[in-house]
Amino acid sequence: MPARRYKPTSPGRRNSSVLTRDSVTKEKPEKSLLAKLHKTGGRNVHGRITTRHKGGGHKRRYRIIDFKRNKDGVPATVAAIEYDPNRSANIALLHYHDGEKRYILAPRNLTVGSVVMSGPEAEVDVGNALPLANIPVGTTVHAVELEPGRGAQLARSAGTSAQIIAREGNLVTLRLPSGERRRVRAECRATVGVVGNQSHQNVRWGKAGRKRHLGIRPTVRGTVMNPVDHPHGGGEGKSTPGRAPVTPWGKITQGKPTRKKRKRSDAMIVARRKKGRRR
């Protein structure tokens, strides 16, 4: 699914690219697996902005994804690979042999007609979901649970994966996409393989309008605001903030750790993620 560059017929097209979606085999989603999706504009129930730079965008319907993969022992055939506007990865429509239909994240090299299965007895093949205790060390997995039965929470974005690097007792050590090494209970489930649509990171949006279609609003620098709006604001012309970089609420930013101290999950983290810019 490579990215296609446009000819520079306009300033917006000059620096833009799109995914070809060669692997997408079905355009219309399965109606029984759709749900309403209400936009919040980044506001909470009181109407206050809790997440900045969100709002607008094309209307969407949510695709109900099976992150638990708890239908054990029943084979399922991949009926289609579909586009999902709510995530960077594509999704696969499964037709179980008992008649049920479900969506899962589409791993790389999973094609229409492939047969997948979930459960402790499943083989270690691409698209199969099974407990980490039954997956060999060194295997690449995605859609990993943090707690048994809670559903996949790790390595769900396009092109991401985690690797099993050790097993000790009831705990399995994973190397996550960020570089963090973390222990997870062996009963937690994971799906074998790498999340597909890895070319998503190569897309160049080209113009602001394409980001607005995604529901992403502009990010304004604090130094061009008024003093009432940001600690960096005000001054005559282009002026320096005169202080260390801070958030709009005055908290130190650009490198200061924001993780809470003494979290319960600290005991499960072997090594924190690599510092610096991540892609």
UniProtKB/Swiss-Prot annotation:
PANTHER family to which the protein is assigned, alphabetical: LARGE RIBOSOMAL SUBUNIT PROTEIN UL2M, RIBOSOMAL PROTEIN L2
Organism, as annotated: Rubrobacter xylanophilus (strain DSM 9941 / JCM 11954 / NBRC 16129 / PRD-1)
Biased composition range(s): Polar residues: 12-22
Purpose of the protein: One of the primary rRNA binding proteins. Required for association of the 30S and 50S subunits to form the 70S ribosome, for tRNA binding and peptide bond formation. It has been suggested to have peptidyltransferase activity; this is somewhat controversial. Makes several contacts with the 16S rRNA in the 70S ribosome.
Record-given protein name: Large ribosomal subunit protein uL2
One GO biological process term: cytoplasmic translation
GO annotation, cellular component aspect: large ribosomal subunit
Ranges where the record places region Disordered: 1-28, 221-279
GO molecular function, one term: rRNA binding
